[in-house]
C-alpha cells in the first residue's frame, strides 16, 4: 500500500468519525440527516451529465438490490438518530461500526455471496462480539443479561442491521453494474452509482420529513437557526466516500482499505472523550481494544 493510500484512508476515517461527532453534538434529527444526505446528492449530481450509465434501463435485479440498499439506509438513519439521543458516542460509535462485521458474513455466507470465511476470520468475529459486550458496561461486574435489554442496545442493533443491509446490497448492485457496463471504469461506475443512490436517499428522507409535523418543525428549526452543521456533516460524509474511492486506486488489495478504515473507531471514541467530554471508563478501553484486535484478525 502506498503512502498516498494510507493518508487518504486515514483522512476518510477521521471524516467519518467527525460527522458522527457533529451529529451527536447537534442532537441529530431526521431533518438533520435528510440535509446531510442532500449534500451528497448535490455534489454528485453533476456525474449524471457525463456518465454513460443509464439507470432507467437496468435489469430488474439492479432495482431490487437498490431497494434493499435504501431500506438499509432507512434503518441506519433512523437508528442513528435514536442511538445518539440515548448513548454516548464513545460507546455507540465503535459498536455500530463493528457489529456489521458479524452480521454481513452471516448473510453473505447463507446466500452464497462471496468467498467462504477462514477460521481466523471467525475467531476475529468472536473477539469483536466480546468487545461489543464489554463496551456498554460501567463495570465488568455489570455483565448480566438484563443490562443489555434496553433501548440503547436496540437502536445500535437497528443501525448495525441497516449497515449490513446497505453494504450487502450495495455490493450486489455494483456487481450488476459491472456485468451491464464492463467497458466503464470502476471509478466511474462507483461515482455513477453513488449519484443515483444519494439522490434516491435524499428524496426518501425528505418525503418522511414532509409527512410528519414534528419532523417538519425540526427542519424549520434548523432553517431558523441558520445552522451550518448539517452541511458541514454532509460534506464530511461525502468526502469520506470519495476518499475511499480514490484510495482504492493506490492499493494492491482492497482488504487494506477495509482494515485501515477501522482507525475511525478509535478516532470516534477519542472525539467522544475530548470534544464531547464523555466519561472514559475501563470497560470502554477494554472493549475498543478487543474490537480493534478482532477487526485485525478478520480483515488481514
Language-model-derived ranges and their functions:
Residues 257, 264-278, 282-286, 292:
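C-terminal transmembrane helix pair
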Amino acid at each position: 500500500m502506498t503512502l498516498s493510500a494510507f493518508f487518504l484512508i486515514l483522512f476518510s476515517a477521521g471524516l467519518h468519525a467527525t460527522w458522527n461527532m457533529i451529529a451527536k453534538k447537534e442532537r441529530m434529527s431526521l431533518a438533520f440527516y435528510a440535509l446531510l444526505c442532500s449534500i451528497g446528492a448535490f455534489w454528485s449530481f453533476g456525474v449524471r451529465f457525463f456518465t454513460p450509465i443509464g439507470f432507467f434501463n437496468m435489469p430488474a435485479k439492479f432495482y431490487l438490490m437498490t431497494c434493499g440498499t435504501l431500506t438499509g439506509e432507512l434503518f441506519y438513519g433512523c437508528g442513528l438518530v435514536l442511538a445518539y439521543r440515548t448513548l454516548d458516542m464513545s460507546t455507540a460509535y465503535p459498536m455500530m461500526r463493528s457489529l456489521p462485521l458479524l452480521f454481513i458474513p452471516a448473510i453473505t455466507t447463507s446466500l452464497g455471496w462471496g468467498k467462504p470465511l477462514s477460521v481466523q476470520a471467525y475467531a476475529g468475529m468472536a473477539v469483536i462480539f466480546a468487545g461489543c459486550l464489554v463496551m456498554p458496561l460501567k463495570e465488568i461486574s455489570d455483565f448480566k443479561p438484563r443490562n443489555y435489554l434496553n433501548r440503547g442496545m436496540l437502536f445500535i442493533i437497528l443501525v448495525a442491521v441497516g449497515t449490513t443491509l446497505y453494504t450487502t446490497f450495495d455490493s450486489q448492485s455494483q456487481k450488476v453494474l459491472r456485468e451491464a457496463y464492463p467497458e466503464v471504469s470502476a471509478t466511474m461506475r462507483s461515482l455513477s452509482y453513488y449519484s443515483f443512490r444519494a439522490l434516491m436517499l435524499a428524496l426518501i428522507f425528505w418525503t418522511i420529513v414532509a409527512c410528519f409535523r414534528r419532523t417538519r418543525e425540526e427542519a424549520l428549526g434548523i432553517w431558523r437557526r441558520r445552522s451550518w452543521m448539517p452541511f458541514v456533516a454532509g460534506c464530511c460524509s461525502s468526502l469520506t466516500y470519495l476518499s475511499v474511492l480514490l484510495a482504492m486506486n493506490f492499493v494492491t488489495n482492497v482488504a487494506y482499505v477495509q482494515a485501515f478504515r477501522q482507525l475511525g473507531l478509535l478516532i470516534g471514541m477519542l472525539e467522544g472523550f475530548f470534544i464531547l467530554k464523555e466519561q472514559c471508563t475501563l470497560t470502554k478501553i477494554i472493549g475498543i481494544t478487543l474490537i480493534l484486535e478482532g477487526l485485525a484478525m478478520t480483515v488481514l
